[in-house]
Regions:
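Acidic/His- and Gly-rich active-site-bordering loop/insert found
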Residues: 2-138
Length: 140
């Protein structure tokens, strides 16, 4: 079990202000990201986008090719159906000058399922659209 670290009112207010101040730019960032098709085994351009964004924000970026032979004998490994030859992982790390507090790890994936029949979409799947305060688009 992990202990909760309290967030004081000043820190909470600073976080809320930072979100509000950067909302438009982050929404634009997400829209740019959604415009990049990233179906499974075709994630390269989306990974390049994220790696560049991490570098621009000052993160140390580790971008490496995933070797199937390193994984195939691990417990829980499942069969890969498709071309895994270009599979990569992109990791961004922020290393502060002074270590204070705890670490935070955010992990995710960026591949999306196929779009299906385009005529079933109200808007093109890779063209973000904001409706009722929510962004719609493949991967949003």
């Amino acid at each position: 079990m992990t202990a909760h670290l309290p967030v004081d009112d000043a820190d909470r207010a600073a976080i809320v202000a930072a979100v509000a101040d950067n909302f438009e730019s982050q929404t634009a960032f997400l829209a740019d990201f959604v415009r990049i098709p990233s179906q499974r085994f075709e994630e390269g351009p989306a990974q390049d986008f994220i790696a560049a964004a991490l570098r621009a924000r000052g993160y140390e970026v580790d971008d490496w090719k995933i070797e199937l032979d390193d994984l195939k004998d691990l417990k829980g490994f499942g069969p890969i159906e498709g071309d895994f030859s270009r599979a990569r992982s992109v990791v961004g790390a922020h290393r502060p000058d002074q270590v204070k507090g705890r670490s935070l790890i955010l992990q995710g994936h960026l591949d999306v399922v196929p779009t299906g029949p385009l005529e079933m979409w109200e808007t093109p799947p890779y063209e973000p659209a904001i409706k009722d305060g929510w962004m719609n688009g493949r991967g949003a």
